[in-house]
Amino acid sequence: MSDHAMTALITGAAGGIGRVLCAEFRRAGYRVIGTDMAGAPGIACDHFIEADLKAVSRDEACLKRFVQQLNIPASGLTALVNNAAVQILNRTDTVSVQDWRDTLDVNVLAPFLLTQALLPYLEKAGGSVVNMGSVHAIATKPGFVCYATSKAALVGLTRALAVDLGGRIRVNAINPAAVATPMLLQGFKGKDAQFSALGGMHPLGRIAEPAEIAQVVLFLVSRNAAFITGAAFDVDGGILSRLHDPD
């Protein structure tokens, strides 16, 4: 690709949503830089970097090395998609301090530090940031104390950055509900009734496809969204609008 091509950095590139994000961004003409804990076959990246976001968020030297490894072109960075996350499930009486640190470092601090470190490149390209929130930022269930708190914080960070950075770059978030990733589908293997029930909880009658999430992200980083910043889009099939009272 030329030095003037659109460039996107996508974290969590090896995951179910991340892989599709990479593929859809490349299809849309972006040069894609992907990063994750470890590489895997079939990731549609032009450049892949193995990186532990816990280390990146805890060690300034590690963060600097990571940014150098990105090899961002002279034209700058068009899109930063903070997609990586950890989900540690524990009830209140068993959550540890380490659970909190691991969750907040990856899900909140890393998106902030990457936005901060890459701000000059994003400004140069007139770029924007999309943070991957979750419906758990708004409505959650038992066992998700750390995860739900971190996603609520990430949505709050999105709004705060949008206000603080003003017209320099745009910052938005999306809150997906259940998504048909390979990991989720494997978890429901042989459990057709439970999978059908999960889809039925959404007014649209199904869960999301990863490509549907990717298309919302692509819209938010496009010029068609030039007047949108500080927003959090619920890509949830209507589940947050529905009461689940017994019939």
Locations of regions flagged by a protein language model:
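Canonical Rossmann dinucleotide-binding motif of NAD(H)/NADP(H)-dependent dehydrogenases/reductases
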Residues: S2-I33
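Substrate-binding pocket helix/loop in short-chain dehydrogenase/reductase
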Residues: R91-T92, S96-R101, L198
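Active-site helix of classical SDR
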Residues: T115, S150, T158
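Alpha-helical segment proximal to the catalytic Tyr-Lys
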Residues: P120, A162-G167, A226
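Residue(s) in the substrate-gating loop at a strand-loop-helix junction
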Residues: S134
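Short C-terminal tail/terminal secondary-structure segment
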Residues: A139, T229-D247
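C-terminal helical subdomain
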Residues: A173, A193-I228, V235-G237
